[in-house]
Each structure stands twice: as C-alpha cells, then as structure tokens.
C-alpha cells in the first residue's frame, strides 16, 4: 500500500459550495456492461488526498473485506484487489473486470476530473459502488459524487467513539436481514448536511437518544446506511466503519458482506421502496355535485372487496349547505343519511349503493349539540364473493328515544347485489344491539375487522362527554340526564357489564345470530361479586374512542388506535396529559381507560359528593371501579401497557416514579420514548399491517420492504404520526414500543392539497393503498372529502434476474 493517511479533516456541503463543481472532460472509455463476471472481483480504492502513513482504519477495512471474500458460502465469495492508484479509473479494461468498487477513502479530492468521469462511466455501465464512512467526504466539489454517496457529513459531526443503538428497519436487504432489530455498537456517528431520507432507500438508522449527536444532528430520522440505484448502477453507503474495531465485529462484517452481495450482482435487493418519487398519490373521487352526495358522504370508513372494488361510508353529516335539526321536540332531530358508496377501479366510476336513516346529523357546536353517532363502520363477509354480505355498524334514527335521549347501536348484516350495485335494505339481519346515550356527544368508535377464524371484532367508543373532568380522566359521576351519566366513563369503558368503550368479539352465524368464541375477556357467566356483572362479547375493555381497528391476516394480531382526552399538559394533581393511543393486542385485556394511560400511568380517582376533589391514584395492576354508575365488577382485570402513546409534548411521554409507582407528572422531568412523533390537535387513526403478495401480478403493489409493518396515523398532518412502524415480535402486545418508525408523509402527501385529514386507510387486493381524506370541515363533507389511491411505480428489485452473476442468493 502506498503511504498515506485518511484525512481527518472534513469538508462538508456548505463549505464545498464556495467552489464550483468542475465539468469532467468527455471520456472515450467503453466499459463492458455490466462490469465484472461470475468470477466476482471487488476493487477497494483507498486513495488519499493527504500524505503520511495509511490509517489503521483503512487497513482494518481492507483486511476485513479480503477475509469476507475468502470465507462464507462459496456462492458468496469474491476476489479482492486493493489499490491507492486512481489511474485504475481511466483503464477501461481493468475497471471493467470488477463487479463492485469499494471506497475506503478519506476526504478531499481523491480523483481528478478524468478519473471521476471514469467512475461515472463504470456506474453507467451497471457497476456497483460501496462507500464506507469517510468516503462521504471524498470529492467534495462533485455534485455527481454527492449523489453517488447520497449525503455529506456535517462539519459538526461528533469525533468521539460512542456506543449507540442502530434501528435496522429493512429486514430483507442482504446487508441487514441477519442483523438484530436493535443493533448496539460503538462507532463515530456522522450527522448529515441534508437528510437523505426519501431520496435514498434507508436500511438502518441510528437512534440519537442513545448517544450525544452534537449540533447539526438529524433528529429521530437519522439514516446511517442506505442504498439506491444510481446512474445505471447500484450504490450502497454506510456511515459506520469509522473505527478500526468495527471491522472485527461479526455483525458489521455481515453488513458489509450483504452490501457487497448486492453491489457485485451476487444477490438482488429492493433499494427503491422508501424513495418518495417512486409513489403516486391520486385522488379518485370528484367533488360532489351541489346538493348531492353522488361521490362521497361525510367520510368515515372503507373496506376493499376481493375484486378490487372499494366500499366506503359516510357517517351522516350533511353537506354544509344543508340545514340540520337540533331541536329535540322535532321528530327529525339529528336525522342524517348514512351512505355506502362503491368505487370500481375497472370503470373508475362511483355508485351509491345504499342509504340508511341514521341519528348523526346535528352539525357542530358544543357537546350538547353535536353528535358522533351515525354510520360508523363497514366490513365485508369473508365469503363476500359468494354471499354478498355487508356488515354495518350504525345508529338507526328509528330507534332513538327523544325523551330519555337514548338510542340503540346496531351491528347488522345486509346483502349487496353485485348485478344492480345496490344494497338490499330489506335484507337486514340485526346481529347485535345495545343502548347508547345521545344527550351529549361523543366517542362512538366504529371500526370492524375479521380474524382468520371468522370472528368479527367491533370497536365501540366510551359514549362519554369530553367535558366535566378538565381534560383528564373521564370519571365525573355527577352530570346525568334523566338518570343516565354522560361524563363518567366508568359507566362504560371501565364497566365489565357495558358494551361501550370496548372491542367486542363475536362469531356471526349463517342465520344472522352470533355465538361467543372461546377466549374473550369474560364469558358472561362469571359468578364473582354476585354474578351477572360481565358481558361475554367483550374482548378488550378500557378504550376511549377506537374509530379504527385492523387485524394482521398473517398473525391474527389485533391493532387498534383511540383518541385521548383534552388536557394539554400533565398534572401533578390529576395525571397524564391527553394521550392518543395505539395498541398491538395479542390477547384479551384491559387497556386502561379511564383509570390509566400509556405505559400504566394512572389518573386520580374522584367521586361523589364532590367530584372536584381528587381522591387516591388508581392502581393500574389492580384497578377498582367504585363509580355509583357502575353495574359491573368492582375488581377489574389488570391494565395492559399500550404500544404507542403521544401528547402535545411528544411521543411516549414517561416520568420518574415514586416508591408506589406513581409518575411525577412534572413537565420538566418527562422524557420521550418515541421521539419521532408529537401531538397537538390529535386523533389517532389505526391503519393496516401490510402483507406483500409475491403471487400478485399487480405492478402497482407496494414493495415487500413494507411487509409486516404496521401503519399508524392521525387525522391531523403536522407532527402527528403518519408512519409505518416495526415491532419486536418478542414484546408486541406486552407493552413493547416500536423499534423503528418510517415516515410516510411524503408518500401519503400531507397539506391542504394532499391527504390532510386522514380518516381511514386500507390496502386493496392489488397491494395498493386506499385512503379517505375527511375534508376540511367537521360533521360535514366538502370539496376536499375524497377517496385516494397511493400506488408504487418504482419497479422491481435490482439487478435484474438475468444480470445476477450466480444463482440468486
């Protein structure tokens, strides 16, 4: 090796802009396409812009890559040539021998313009490139080389070796598939002048909360390894490998081996899946005609049929130009139209399949005027293609009691006639019904979902006012209307004998009845506390307003999200701020509301005669329902910690706890376990778990990278979540928080002209994502209310199968 030293100095993007990028001269090089052969060869270039001895880090890197080439399975081996002579990049014959080029360089100009042009010709011919750590500091004045490596280190990057946690989000790329989900290792961690996420495919990120990133840090989304197809070839870069000891690590060597397998055409990989430009978001429905809901109602849920049609519902709010009736003396008070529309992707047309008269149209205003009831949820029977059965969760207007201000909620089965495109309203079979108070808004829930055993899950809200508790636990027993409490969620969500504030699980039968599957939270036959105090339909209790639920069709795991109360900050008197919540649910349980939130953070109890006075803290491990409005068990199941929770202050707020396990609830002492999200205005919208179908011929399906990732979102589109998260299977459903989160905000576009107010989202059988945008008002539809489709257009993995040098690895 020639004497030299890897430059510790460091030119960053801003400094580089002071000098214009030189125009490389035209080259007459003609490199065979693609370069290399089945006798795989890798070139390590370690040229230096400075004199002196070779860096020990570079020597360690060369030795590690040489060893990788001679070890492991025969099909993955390769030969290595290491050089610091840049003239190789102007020798078309020599350069064309190499399947991949590795840059183990320092900063500065390590290539002259002609040599850089040769490297560019090599990539255009289909070559592979692997840049390691300081390679991102090379060729600082070249825009083309910046694109090749993907990003430039910030001058403020820390120089000390620090131990940190790497989140390995890509579980399929050969460079990462064998690595731990959370990879803890020491290195010199680089900050980037411009975050490359969205322009490259990031396979791993470093978690800034686990080390000191210094000034110019990139935040929760801090890429550390990425790849992309670039200028005809394949480019992989890792910011790791900045220490000599890195190259002794088995897992880091595995990372390099996988990167070289892809860049040298031994293995395929998808390096396009998270590049924003590879997706297209298209509005499918048009604004309604004046005075009509010919395209869409007040958006409230969707489901896709096996043939690709999309069924979506309108809750019942009228077009804003239409009058509403709020006078309880009027028999038509709150009457609205719960509409079922169908979008056919083959004809690209919308039809109105049916309309139900629902209680749900009182417009906006305070909680004694507005209402969230109506047509709340839709699902299709697992054998829909054969029987045409559609299940609707709704509040029929015909069943309201205007005197007592009570209503009934139905889960009904209807038959859809595919030939006429109409729902047969006379075919209704009411499977399940239960009472709800309608004196005060809110929290109706609505989501429906099936598991693989034919069990139907039904999400119900706590049917409780948001007021009278200062935005903390909804546990004020005092307000009532004609004997029915409307501000005490212990009557509903915290009550083992009430179907509100729950996720129910039933098994619909052919005749329109239902049976109870084994394994619900209760059997309904419990004899505790005198008996008759449980409902066997309850699978999950303690949820506030679960508008959306989903079930992973591979694992049968239930996923849910629910909206929290209104307190803007935590209180040392009453407890946590408003937490919107997501939960991965693997077994029946109590998820806390209105006793505990987040990771078992308790509220303060209150009761008669003076609910304004705080009593003791709830015990999340042994909660008691001592409300005068409770007709269920006093002794409740222990609270299960949730997966994601967020407040206006940040994601996953947590506090120091005293000897009794009570958090301090002091704002200055809170830390955030989930720094990638934040609330404010917030309304959690659970999404699907994507499952990639390799047998599907759809060219627009989302890539396999997303397989197994859970989509979590919010009605609002600022700091609130719109992410795909990855859970550790070992802790999912047991209080484990996500190990990785990928922003979707540029794939599912935010903003007024995008999908600003996300209401529901589901993948169709073609692997494309359908999304409902609620619109810009409340309790109405408007010109922005729409059904959207998000499709993938990036193409398949690379290199193409016929360009692999050996049988696919």
Predicted regions and their residues:
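Secretory targeting and sorting signals
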Residues: 1-20
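Extracellular ligand-binding/catalytic regions of CAZymes and related secreted enzymes
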Residues: 23-39, 67, 210-212, 216-224, ...
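Helical hinge/lid and interdomain linker segments adjacent to catalytic or ligand-binding clefts
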Residues: 41-138
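Catalytic beta-strand/loop cores that center a nucleophilic Ser/Cys/Thr
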Residues: 72, 151, 155-232
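A glycine-rich, often tryptophan-bearing local segment used as a flexible ligand/cofactor-contacting loop or short
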Residues: 103, 108-179
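Beta-propeller domain segments
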Residues: 270-276, 318-338, 364-368, 373-375, ...
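Residue-level detector of Asp-centered blade-edge/turn motifs that repeat once per structural unit
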Residues: 304-307, 382-386, 450-453, 552-555, ...
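Asp-box/WD-like beta-propeller blade repeats and closely related beta-sheet repeat scaffolds
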Residues: 405-449
């Amino acid at each position: 090796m020639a004497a030299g030293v890897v430059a510790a100095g460091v030119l960053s993007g801003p400094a580089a802009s002071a000098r214009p990028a030189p125009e490389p001269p035209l080259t007459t090089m003609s490199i065979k396409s693609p370069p290399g052969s089945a006798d795989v060869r890798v070139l390590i270039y370690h040229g230096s812009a400075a004199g002196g001895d070779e860096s020990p880090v570079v020597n360690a890197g060369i030795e590690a890559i040489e060893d990788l080439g001679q070890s492991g399975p025969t099909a993955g081996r390769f030969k290595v040539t290491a050089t610091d002579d840049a003239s190789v990049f102007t020798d078309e014959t020599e350069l064309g021998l190499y399947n991949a080029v590795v840059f183990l360089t320092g900063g500065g100009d390590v290539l002259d313009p002609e040599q850089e042009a040769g490297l560019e010709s090599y990539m255009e011919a289909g070559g592979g490139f692997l840049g390691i750590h300081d390679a991102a500091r090379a060729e600082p004045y070249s825009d083309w080389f910046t694109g090749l490596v993907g990003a430039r280190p910030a001058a403020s990057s820390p120089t000390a070796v620090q131990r940190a946690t790497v989140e390995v989000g890509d579980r399929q790329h050969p460079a990462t598939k064998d690595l731990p989900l959370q990879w803890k290792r020491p290195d010199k961690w680089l900050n980037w002048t411009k975050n490359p996420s969205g322009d490259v495919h990031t396979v791993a990120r470093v978690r800034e909360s686990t080390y000191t990133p210094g000034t110019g840090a990139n935040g929760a989304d801090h890429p550390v390894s990425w790849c992309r197809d670039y200028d005809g070839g394949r480019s992989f870069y890792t910011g790791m490998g900045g220490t000599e000891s890195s190259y002794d690590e088995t897992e880091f060597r595995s990372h390099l081996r996988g990167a070289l397998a892809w860049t040298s055409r031994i293995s395929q990989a998808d390096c396009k899946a998270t590049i924003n430009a590879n997706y297209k978001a298209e509005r499918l429905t048009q604004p309604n005609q004046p005075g009509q809901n010919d395209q869409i109602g007040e958006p409230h849920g969707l489901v896709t049929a096996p043939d690709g049609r999309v069924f979506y519902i309108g809750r019942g709010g009228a077009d804003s130009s239409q009058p509403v009736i709020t006078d309880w003396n009027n028999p038509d008070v709150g009457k609205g139209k719960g509409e079922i529309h169908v979008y056919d992707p083959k004809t690209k047309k919308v039809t109105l399949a049916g309309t139900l008269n629902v209680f749900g149209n009182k417009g906006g205003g305070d909680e004694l005027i507005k209402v969230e009831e109506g047509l709340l949820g839709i699902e299709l029977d697992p054998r829909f293609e054969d029987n045409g059965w559609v299940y609707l969760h709704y509040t029929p207007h015909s069943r309201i009691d205007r005197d007592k201000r009570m209503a009934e909620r139905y889960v009904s089965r209807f038959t859809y006639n595919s030939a006429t495109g109409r729902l047969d309203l006379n075919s209704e079979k009411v499977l399940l019904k239960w009472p709800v108070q309608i004196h005060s808004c809110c929290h109706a829930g609505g989501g429906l979902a099936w598991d693989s055993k034919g069990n139907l899950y039904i999400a119900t809200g706590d049917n409780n006012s948001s007021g009278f508790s200062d935005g903390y636990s909804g546990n004020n027993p005092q307000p009532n209307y004609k004997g029915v409490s409307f501000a005490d969620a212990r009557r509903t969500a915290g009550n083992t004998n009430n179907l509100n504030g729950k996720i129910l699980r039933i098994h619909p039968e052919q005749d329109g009845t239902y049976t109870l599957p084994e394994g619900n939270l209760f059997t309904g036959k419990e004899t505790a506390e005198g008996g008759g105090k449980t409902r066997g339909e309850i699978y999950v209790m303690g949820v506030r307003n679960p508008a959306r639920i989903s079930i992973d069709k591979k694992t049968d795991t239930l996923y849910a999200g629910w909206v929290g109360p209104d307190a803007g900050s935590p209180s040392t008197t009453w407890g946590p701020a408003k937490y919107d919540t997501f939960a991965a649910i693997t077994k029946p349980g109590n998820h806390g509301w209105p006793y505990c939130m987040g990771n078992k953070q308790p509220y303060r109890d209150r009761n008669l005669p003076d609910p304004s006075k705080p009593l003791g803290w709830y015990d999340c491990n042994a909660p008691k329902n001592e409300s005068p409005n409770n007709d269920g068990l006093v002794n409740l199941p222990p609270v299960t910690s949730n997966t994601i929770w967020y407040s206006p202050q940040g994601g996953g707020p947590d506090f120091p706890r005293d000897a009794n396990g009570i958090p301090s609830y002091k704002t200055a002492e809170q830390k955030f376990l989930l720094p990638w999200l934040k609330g404010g205005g917030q309304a959690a919208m659970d999404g699907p778990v994507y499952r990639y179908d390799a047998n599907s011929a759809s060219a627009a399906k989302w890539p396999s990278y997303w397989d197994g990732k859970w989509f979590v979102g919010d009605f609002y589109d600022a700091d609130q979540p719109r992410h795909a998260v990855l859970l550790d299977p070992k802790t999912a459903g047991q209080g484990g928080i996500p190990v990785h989160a990928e922003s979707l905000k540029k794939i599912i576009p935010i903003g007024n002209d995008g999908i600003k107010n996300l209401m529901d989202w589901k993948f169709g059988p073609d692997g494309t994502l359908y999304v409902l945008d609620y619109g810009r008002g409340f309790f109405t539809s408007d010109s922005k209310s729409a059904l959207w489709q998000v499709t993938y257009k990036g193409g398949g993995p690379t290199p193409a199968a016929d360009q692999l040098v050996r049988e696919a690895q």
